[in-house]
Structures are given as C-alpha cells and as structure tokens.
UniProtKB/Swiss-Prot annotation:
Stated role: This protein binds to the 23S rRNA, and is important in its secondary structure. It is located near the subunit interface in the base of the L7/L12 stalk, and near the tRNA binding site of the peptidyltransferase center.
Keyword Ribosomal protein among UniProt keywords: yes
Gene: rpl6
Protein name listed in UniProt: Large ribosomal subunit protein uL6
Organism: Thermococcus kodakarensis (strain ATCC BAA-918 / JCM 12380 / KOD1) (Pyrococcus kodakaraensis (strain KOD1))
Cellular component annotations (GO), alphabetically ordered: cytosolic large ribosomal subunit
PROSITE patterns hit by this protein: RIBOSOMAL_L6_2 (PS00700)
InterPro entries: Ribosomal_uL6-like (IPR000702), Ribosomal_uL6-like_a/b-dom_sf (IPR036789), Ribosomal_uL6_a/b-dom (IPR020040), Ribosomal_uL6_arc (IPR019907), Ribosomal_uL6_CS2 (IPR002359)
C-alpha cells in the first residue's frame, strides 16, 4: 500500500556550487572539486528547479520513502564534500613495540607493528590524501565514502585477533570522524 500520494524532498543548492542532473547521474561541482554519482531507482525522479535539487516519487511505499531520503542524504554529502570536505583523524597507539607509519604511493605502510618483520599495508582510495604527523594520521578528501573507507582500511590493517585486547592495545584507531569525536 502506498504511504502517500507522493513524496518530494528538496535540497537547497548553496552559492558557489553547481548541480547538474543527466539521466540518473548527479554531478556536483564546487570550490574543492567535482563529484558524480549514479542514483537510480525505478520511479524516482531527480531534477533541478529554482536553485534546488528535487527528488520525487509518486505513490511511494515505505521502501520508496527510504530510498528517496537516502538519495537526499547522498546529495547533501556530495554538496558538503565539494564545499567543506571531510576529515578523519586517527591515533597511533603503542606500548610494547614502537611502530612507524608512512605513506608510500597509494598505500600506508605500518612497520614494526607488534615487532613483526613484514610491514602491514593499507590501501588509500583515489581522491584521498593521507598525512602522518607523529602519532596522528589525517585522512582528507571530498568523497565521504572514500575518506571513511581509507580510514577503515588503516584501522583494519592493525587489527589484533589472536592476542588479549586488554593487554595488547597497540594499533591505529579512529578518534574523529568528519569533525565529530568518537566516544570509547
């Protein structure tokens, strides 16, 4: 059963940002760069009118309402990315073995983690910059998903599975996600 006759979500386009919709592809261009994403779902229409992006669906069911609001969140994140960008902060923590972290090409290389001879590597996704400053790592970019996945790759590379986490707390941990501190 349809929830309503229609659902219409509108997003204001801020100054200095240009949004174009071609078919199912939404392109957002701003001062920090350009992002594009394919947003496709049967019956959902995306278009621009009067300085707004409109997402519209007739006779939506619950799932359709969720999809429309998901598309709205994706477009909002694209607009925020090209205007402000996204930044994750990670902290390098060690007590037993001093590890070194450095960026080589499109990888983060972690050496001497728990005294291991072979370095551990984490992939950096395209469009993301990683800076290592002592015991802090900054991951920045305009695509929220790429920045978040790169930070997760770095955190995952130093995951300990076989040892007691209460004793061996060495690793790299996300401490701030897109400007919001993480509570432990």
């Amino acid at each position: 059963m349809p929830v309503d006759a229609w659902i219409r979500e509108e997003i204001e386009i801020p100054e200095g940002v240009e949004v174009t919709v071609e078919g199912n592809t939404v392109k957002v261009k701003g001062p920090k760069g350009e992002l594009q994403r394919e947003l496709k779902y049967p019956g959902v229409q995306i278009f621009t009118e009067d300085g707004k992006v409109v997402i519209y669906k007739e006779f939506p069911r619950k799932k359709d309402v969720a999809i429309v609001r998901t598309f709205k969140a994706h477009i909002n994140n694209m607009i925020k990315g090209v205007t402000e960008g996204f930044k994750y902060r990670l902290k390098v923590v060690y007590s037993h073995f001093p590890m070194t972290v450095k960026v080589q090409g499109d990888e983060v290389v972690i050496e001497n983690f728990l005294g291991e001879k072979n370095p551990r590597r984490a992939k950096i996704l395209p469009g993301v910059t990683v800076k290592v400053k002592g015991s802090e790592i900054e991951v920045e970019g305009i695509d929220k998903e790429a920045v978040g996945q790169t930070a997760a790759n770095i955190e995952q590379a130093t995951r300990i599975t076989k040892w007691d986490r209460r004793v061996f707390q060495d690793g790299i941990y996300i401490v701030e996600k897109a400007g919001k501190p993480i509570k432990f």
